[in-house]
Amino acid sequence: MEEATHGRLGRPTAHLLLPCRSDSVPVVRALLSRDLERWAVPEEVADAILLASGEAVTNAVVHGAWGQQDSAMVIRWAMAGGRFSFSVQDRGPGFDSSGTAMSRRAHPSQNRGRGLYIMHALMDRVVVDSGLNGTRILLEKALDAGAGRLGRGL
């Protein structure tokens, strides 16, 4: 499952290949939480990273499997130069990521549809690359003191 703990140049990194199933979400959360603690990421920042990355993985589980029981997702995270990055790649049908849904707050009566909004609110950079062969979400967060922000706020 976990393929690496250090990437090229000795940078802390993780690379996972997991099934697109709901039981993969707590696995990612536990492993990522362990790494954030090991890297001494401040608790408030770690909480923001865990919430945003959990939303990204949940989106891959919900939308990426697309009825395929053997569908998998590739998850990576790394720490380099005071920046944390996290990505999840699924093989789903993709979606139109150009809409305003990514920055729009969901109506309070909705049970779903807040994931991309939450990711944008908590992370410094969110990139969504979606097409017919799947979707990749990249999240980035500056960890240097004063270099980033906790988020834009919900």
Task: Cite the ranges covered by each PLM segment.
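Structural signature of the histidine kinase catalytic ATP-binding subdomain
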Residues: 20, 41-44, 79
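Conserved beta-strand-loop-beta-strand hairpin that lines the nucleotide-binding pocket
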Residues: 1-15, 61-154
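Conserved short strand/loop->alpha-helix "switch" segment adjacent to the catalytic nucleotide/phosphoryl-transfer site
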Residues: 30-54, 108-110
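STAS-typified acidic loop motif
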Residues: 15-27
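Hydrophobic residues in the alpha-helical elements that line and stabilize the ATP-binding pocket
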Residues: 56, 60
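Short, small-residue-rich loop/turn micro-motifs
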Residues: 29-32, 90-92
